[in-house]
C-alpha cells in the first residue's frame, strides 16, 4: 500500500474511533462542550489559564460537566458543593489518582502522589506515620523549622538591604526542612550540590505550569517523539532521582535498625523487616522524590507570592508587624503557640493562600468504581478535575474574591474565622500529606522575616503586578526584586 494512502486510512480510522467513543458514552456522562475528533476540546481551552476556561464552561453547563482532553473524557467538578460532595462525602469513590502522563513517566507507578489502589494506601499510611513519629505538627519538626527560619533570616541579612530576587533564598528554606526530615541533614545555602538540586526543582515547577506541558499531558504518545521542554523536565527528574539514590546508598552503609535518624532509615528498616513488594529501593527513591517536590516548591512559591502581596499592601505588612511586636517581641523566635494569639497574622496567611490559588485545578482524581453522581453515570477510571479556584474564589464565602482582603478570615470582633471553603491543600482522602508541615513553615518563616525586616519595594506599590505569569498546574508569581531592611 502507498505510504500516503496508509497514513490517510490510519487517520480516518482514528477519526471514526474517536467519534464512536465520544458518542457511545455521551448520554451517560454529564453534558459539556462538543469535542472535536481526536483532539477533543483542547482548542476551546486556554492552556495558559485552564481554570478560567473551566469557569466559562460551568456558566453554560453547570457545576458538573464533561470535557474531552484528547480522546479521553474528563469530568469537571466546579463549585464548593460539587467538590465537597465528591472528595469528602464520596471520598472512597473519588480517591483514585487521575492520569498525569509526564509524572507517570517519571514515577513509573511508584511513590506517594501518583499511585493508586494498595500501593498508594501503603505508601501514604507509612509516610504519614513516619512523619508524625518524627513530629510533623509537633515539637521536633517545629524545632527544625525554627532553626531553618533563623538560618533564613541570617541569609537575608547578607543581602545588606540591597535589591535582590528572593526566589532562590525562599526555595532553600523549605527544601532544607525536607532534607532535615528525610536525610537527617541540612545544607549550607552556598553548597554546590544543594544549588544544583534547587535549580532543577525550581525549573521543573515552571515547566509543569507551562502551556506546552498542558498540551503534552493530553497527547504524550505523539509528543514523546518531538523535542520540547518535557525532555528538560525528565532530565531534571533523573538528576534528582540520582541524587536521592546516592543518599540512600550512604544511609544503607550507616543504618542502625535500633536508631532510625530520618525517613530513609525508617523505610530501609521496613524493607529489612518485612517482605513487602510495595517497599523497594525504587519505591523509596520515588517516595522521597515526591516529598521533595510536594514539600519544597509549593511552599517556596507560596512564600514568594506572600512577600509580593505584602509589598503590594504595605498597610497589611505593617499591621502584621505590630501584632508580632505585641505578641512575640524582638528577643525570641516565633513558635506555633503564638499563632492562636495572632488572629490577624493567621488571617493574612490564609488569605494569601486563598488569593493566590496555588493549584487551580488540583491534581487529577479518578473514580475507583462506577459512580452515579447527581444523576450522571461516571464509569470506573474516569479522570476527575476539581476546580479549587471555584471554591477559593467563591463569591458567597468570600465577598470580592478577586480582592486581597484578610478580612475574609476575620469576624466582626477581629477574631480568626475558619471557612469550610478554604481548600488550598485539596480535601478528602487525597489531601496533601504535608499539610501540617506546610502550615507550620508558612507561619514561622513569614513571622521570622517580618520580625526582623521591613520589606521595601523598588517601585510604588500601586505599580506592582501581582498577576500570575502562568496559571497552569501551579500559579507562578511574576519575578520581582525587593530590599530586606533590618529593623
Swiss-Prot record:
Subcellular location: Endoplasmic reticulum membrane; Microsome membrane
Pfam families: p450 (PF00067)
Function: Cytochromes P450 are a group of heme-thiolate monooxygenases. In liver microsomes, this enzyme is involved in an NADPH-dependent electron transport pathway. It oxidizes a variety of structurally unrelated compounds, including steroids, fatty acids, and xenobiotics.
Residues that bind heme: 432
Superkingdom in the source lineage: Eukaryota
EC number: 1.14.14.1
Keywords of the record: Endoplasmic reticulum, Heme, Iron, Membrane, Metal-binding, Microsome, Monooxygenase, Oxidoreductase
Gene: CYP2C4
Biological process terms in GO annotation: organic acid metabolic process; xenobiotic metabolic process
Protein name per Swiss-Prot or TrEMBL: Cytochrome P450 2C4
Amino acid at each position: 500500500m502507498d505510504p500516503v494512502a496508509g497514513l490517510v486510512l490510519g487517520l480516518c480510522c482514528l477519526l471514526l474511533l474517536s467519534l464512536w467513543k465520544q458518542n457511545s458514552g455521551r448520554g451517560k456522562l454529564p453534558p459539556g462542550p462538543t469535542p472535536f475528533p481526536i483532539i477533543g476540546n483542547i482548542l476551546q481551552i486556554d492552556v495558559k489559564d485552564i481554570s478560567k476556561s473551566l469557569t466559562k464552561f460551568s456558566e453554560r453547563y453547570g457545576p458538573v460537566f464533561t470535557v474531552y482532553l484528547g480522546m479521553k473524557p474528563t469530568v469537571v467538578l466546579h463549585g464548593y458543593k460539587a467538590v465537597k460532595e465528591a472528595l469528602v462525602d464520596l471520598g472512597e469513590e473519588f480517591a483514585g489518582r487521575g492520569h498525569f502522563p509526564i509524572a507517570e513517566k517519571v514515577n513509573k507507578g511508584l511513590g506517594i502522589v501518583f499511585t493508586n489502589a494498595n500501593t498508594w494506601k501503603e505508601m501514604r499510611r507509612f509516610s504519614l506515620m513516619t512523619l508524625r513519629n518524627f513530629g510533623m505538627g509537633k515539637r521536633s519538626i517545629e524545632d527544625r523549622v525554627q532553626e531553618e527560619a533563623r538560618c533564613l533570616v541570617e541569609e537575608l541579612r547578607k543581602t545588606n538591604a540591597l535589591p535582590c530576587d528572593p526566589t532562590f533564598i525562599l526555595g532553600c528554606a523549605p527544601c532544607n526542612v525536607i532534607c532535615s526530615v528525610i536525610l537527617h541533614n541540612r545544607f549550607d545555602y552556598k553548597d554546590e550540590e544543594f544549588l544544583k538540586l534547587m535549580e532543577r526543582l525550581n525549573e521543573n515547577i515552571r515547566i509543569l505550569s507551562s502551556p506546552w506541558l498542558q498540551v503534552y499531558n493530553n497527547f504524550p504518545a505523539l509528543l514523546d517523539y518531538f523535542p520540547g521542554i518535557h525532555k528538560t523536565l525528565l532530565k531534571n527528574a533523573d538528576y534528582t532521582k540520582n541524587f536521592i539514590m546516592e543518599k540512600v546508598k550512604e544511609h544503607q552503609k550507616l543504618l542502625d535498625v535500633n536508631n532510625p535518624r530520618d525517613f530513609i532509615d525508617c523505610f530501609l528498616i521496613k524493607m529489612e523487616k518485612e517482605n513487602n513488594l510495595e517497599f523497594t529501593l525504587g519505591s523509596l527513591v520515588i517516595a522521597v522524590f515526591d516529598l521533595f517536590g510536594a514539600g519544597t516548591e509549593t511552599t517556596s512559591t507560596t512564600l514568594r507570592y506572600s512577600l509580593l502581596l505584602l509589598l503590594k499592601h504595605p498597610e497589611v505588612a505593617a499591621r502584621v508587624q505590630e501584632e508580632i511586636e505585641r505578641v512575640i517581641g524582638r528577643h525570641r523566635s516565633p513558635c506555633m503557640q503564638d499563632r492562636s494569639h495572632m488572629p490577624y497574622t493567621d488571617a493574612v496567611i490564609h488569605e494569601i493562600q486563598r488569593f493566590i490559588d496555588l493549584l487551580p485545578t488540583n491534581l487529577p482524581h479518578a473514580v475507583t468504581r462506577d459512580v452515579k453522581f447527581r444523576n450522571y453515570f461516571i464509569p470506573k477510571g474516569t479522570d476527575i478535575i476539581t476546580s479549587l479556584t471555584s471554591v477559593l474564589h467563591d463569591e458567597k464565602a468570600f465577598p470580592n474574591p478577586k480582592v486581597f482582603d484578610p478580612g475574609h478570615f476575620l469576624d466582626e470582633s477581629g477574631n480568626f474565622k475558619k471557612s469550610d471553603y478554604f481548600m488550598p491543600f485539596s480535601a478528602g482522602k487525597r489531601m496533601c500529606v504535608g499539610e501540617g508541615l506546610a502550615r507550620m513553615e508558612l507561619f514561622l518563616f513569614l513571622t521570622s522575616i517580618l520580625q526582623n525586616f521591613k520589606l521595601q519595594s523598588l517601585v510604588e506599590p500601586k505599580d506592582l503586578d501581582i498577576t500570575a505569569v502562568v496559571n497552569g498546574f501551579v500559579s507562578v508569581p511574576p519575578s520581582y526584586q525587593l530590599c530586606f531592611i533590618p529593623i
